[in-house]
C-alpha cells in the first residue's frame, strides 16, 4: 500500500532496501527447507531491520510452502535438543483478544487525588496483582498539550524512530544492526502526517472501535503490507502546562513533580535522569508500539495520555515475571541468541526492549495477562517488575516518568543481583538509596509514625529489612577481610557511590581499592584471588558514619515485623559473593562486634593533574560531580603509627593519623573501560514506551558545587615536625660535622632524584588509566599489618 508509506530518511530507506536484498538472498539459498521469516518491530531505531533479525521481536519459523497450511509451529535443533517455538500467528482467529481481562480502573475523588503516592499506596494491595492499572483523573488540563508544546516551549521539534511492522526470527544468524532514524517534525507536522496515514487507510478521520483496531494491529504485524511506522519516543520535555491557572499542571500529578515527592525514594538522587526522574514525551501514530519490557531496576512508572487516539496496554503481574521470562526463553528465543543460560538469559535480551509477540502465546502457557485501553485524561501505572507492552490507535501524545516507594526495595534488590550476574552497570545507586532512606527513618520521631497506613508501615519494614541485610553482610565481609590480613590500609570513604570493577555492583558504604586507584572492588570478592596489575596493596574505603548505621540496624532488628523478615527473606546483598563467609559465632565472629585494623604505615600525599577521561558516559548519574581544581604539590614521607577502630559502639570513631597538614575530600566515579559494555548499556531505558533509549548519552547532569572539606593536621603532627627540625639543627650546628653534612646533602640530592623519578613513573602510569581521581590530594597507604 504505497499510499500509506511514510517519507523516510535516506538511512531508513537504505536499510529497507538492505532488508529486501537479504530476504531475496535467503529465499534463493534455502532450496531444501525454506524458512519464511517475518520481520517485526521489536526495536525502536536501535537494531537492523532484517527479515530474520536477531534484534527484533518474536521467534516465528515455518517450513516450506507446501506444508505451511499443516504446520502451526516449528521446532529447532540446538545441541541435539528439540525446542518448540511460537506458533504461527493465525490471523483468521483473533478471538483471543476478547478473552483478555481488563485491569482495574480507579476513579478517585478530588480529595483522594490530592497526593498521587498516597493514593497509589492505598490501591497497591489490589492493583499490584494485575501489574498495571488505570486511573481516571478528576482534574482536566485547561491548556492543551499542543498549545504547551507549540507556545510555551519555543522551537519544539523532535526526531522520530522508524519501527518495522513484522514478526521476526530470533537466532544468531542475523545480528546486523544499524540505527534507523526518521524525520524531524514539529508537533503539528507530525500530527498532520499521522492523521493523513490513518485517513488513507480507513477513509475516515474519526476514531474506530478499540477492539477492531486491536485485531487490525495483530493482522498487520503478522502479514500486513505496511512496512514501517514512525514513533517519537524518549523526547525530552513535558506537555504539562506551567500556567498557574491549569488545575492538572498545578497539581502533584504533574509528572515533573512525581519523582521528587516526599514519599518517592528517587527524591534522594542528587542528579536528575531523563526518563527516570524527569518525564519524557511519547508521540505516536497508528500502530506505533512499545515492546515487551520491564522498567529499569523494576521501578514504578506512571504514564499520562495528553491527547489523541487511544492506546492499548498489555500487563503482566510482577509475581508472574519469571514465568513470563521462561515462556519467552522457551517459545520465542533460540538458545544461541541468549547471552547466558538460566532465567537471566531471556531477561538480558528483554532489557533491549526490542521484543514484540502476541499475548496469546502467554495465555496458552497460563501466564496472566491484563489489558487496558488508555484514553486522554487517564493515567496508567505499572508496578514493580511488571512486564508490559502496547500500541497506539492513531496520533496521540503521552508522557511518562519513574518513581519508587518503600515497597520497591525488595524488587530493586533483585534487579541489582540480576544486573551483577549479567555484568551490567546499574542506573541507580541502590545501596546509597537504602542507606539514606534508612537513616531518615532512624531519625524520625515516633509521633510521625502514628498515622501510617498498613501499606506505609509495610514499606518502612521493607526499607529497614533491606538495610539490616546490607549492614550485616558488610560487617561480616569486613571481619573476614580483617582476619585475612590482606588489607594494608583504611581510608575514610567520601567518594559517594562507585561501581565495582568486577561485578559492576554499586558500592556506597565500603569498597577495596588498589594502589593505582583504578580497580575498585566491592567486598563480595575474595581479596586473595584478586590479580591486579598494580600489585597487592589493598586499601579499604569505609564510610565515616558506619558506626551510626550499624547502631540503626541493631535498633531496627528489635522492631516487630522486621526481625521476622530478616530470618525469612533471602539476603540478596551478598550476591555475587566469591568469599567464604563464616556463620555467626564461628571463628569468633559476632554480628556488630568491634572490628580492629592495626597498621604500621608509610603515608604519602601526592597531587596529580586531572586526567582526561576516555568515555565518561558511565560515571554514576546519581552523584555526578566535576572537580577541575588542582591541589598544590605536596609531599611527605614520615612514618606514623595508625590504628583504625571500626565498631558499633557510640564512642568508637574511625580515626587515622596522617603526616600531612591537610587533605581534601571529593567523590570518585570510575569510568567503565569496556567500550562494548558501554555500547550495550546505551539501550537501557526506563520508560514503558521506548526502544533503544540512549539515556546515558543524553543525561543532563546538574552542575553542583562540591565543598572541599579541609581537615587541619592535628597538634601531634606539628610537634613531630618541630622535633625533627630541632634534631637537624643540633646535628649541623657543630663545625666539626661539615664534611658529614656535605655527604648527607649529597645523599639527599640522590634521594630526591630517585623520588622524582618514582613520581614521574607513577604519573605516567596513571595517565594511562581512564578510571581515575583528578585534581585532589591522594592518600597512599603502604605498610604491613602489625603482628
Swiss-Prot record:
GO cellular component: nucleus
Location (main, coarse): nucleus
InterPro entries with a match to the protein in the record: JmjC_dom, JmjN, Znf_C5HC2
Impact after mutating residue 236 to A: Impaired demethylase activity
GO MF annotation: an example: histone binding
Entry's localization field: Nucleus
UniProt-annotated binding residues for Zn(2+) 1: 500, 503, 522, 525
Protein role: Histone demethylase that demethylates 'Lys-27' (H3K27me) of histone H3 with a specific activity for H3K27me3 and involved in the regulation of gene expression. Acts as a temperature and photoperiod dependent flowering repressor.
Protein name: Lysine-specific demethylase JMJ13
Lineage, uppermost ranks: Eukaryota, Viridiplantae, Streptophyta, Embryophyta, Tracheophyta
Gene, per the UniProt record: JMJ13
